[in-house]
Amino acid sequence: TRTLKKGDIFISVIGDRNGHDFVAEAFKRGASAALVAYKPNNVSANMPLLIVEDVRIGLEALASFARKRFKGQVIAITGSVGKTSSKDMLALVLSNFGKVNKAEKSFNNHLGVPLTLVRTPPDSDFLIVEIGMSNKKEIAPLSALVQPHIALITDVSEAHLASFNSVVEIAKEKSDICLGLNKRGHCVVSRDSNEYSRLVKYINEFGVNIISFGENKSSMYKLRKTVIKNNKTCAEAVLQNG
C-alpha cells in the first residue's frame, strides 16, 4: 500500500505477508478495486473486490491483457549483471524518441514482471522489462508473457551457481528470453562475453536475429572508446553500416 496511487487496483499477493491484510487500508488510500482470493473480514462485501481462485494467476491474466493492448515496442533485458543499469540507460536514450515506461526498481520476477505490464500506460511508445531468475525455468514463461520485440542478454557469469550446476546451464536459461520473441525479433548479445559462442548456439535454436556489440573486433556494433567527462559517460562506437 505504500506506493499505491488513487485509482490503482490493489493486488493481494500472499507471500511473506498476506496482502489480504492490507485491503482495507488500500481502499482508504483510494484503490479503485482489489484483486483477492477471498473477502477479508474487515472489508465490506459492497467494496469492489475481484475474487479469483489464485491471485498470482489472476495477476498474470491482467498482465496478458495489458500486453495485448499495448501497441508500442517492448524490450526485455536479462543477464547475470547489469540488468537494472542497462534498463535505466536504455530508458534515458529512448526518451528522446517517445514516451518510455520501464520496470520500477528491480521488478524482475514472477510478480514484478506482470506488475510492470499491468502498470504500463497503453499510450507509451516503449516498454522496458527486466527479467531475472533465481531457479531453473523461470525466464521462459516470463518472456512468453512479455512477448518482447527485442531481447538483451547483458552477460552470463557464475552469479546463479547456487541454483545451477554450471555456467552452461545459466547460459541456456538466459537464452530462454528469446522464447517470447517472434521470428522477426532481435536478441542483442555482448560479443565480449566469455559465453558468447554458447549463447549464440542456444539463441539460434529460436530462429531469431542476433545482434552483437562490444569491444571485440567481430562485433556488429563495436565500442571504440568511452570517456567520462563533466559527470557524463561519452561513448564512441562503430555502427554496422559504418
Protein language model features and the residues they cover:
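N-terminal leader/targeting and accessory segments in enzymes
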Residues: 1-61
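ATP-dependent carboxylate-amine ligase
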Residues: 3-9, 14-19, 149, 163, ...
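Short, polar loop motifs at secondary-structure junctions
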Residues: 34-42, 191-194, 215-216
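Adenine nucleotide phosphate-binding catalytic loops in nucleotide-utilizing enzymes
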Residues: 49, 167-168, 201-204, 208-242
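Hydrophobic residues at beta-strand termini and immediately following loops
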Residues: 52, 103, 213
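Phosphate-binding loop of NTP-binding sites
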Residues: 57-191, 195-206
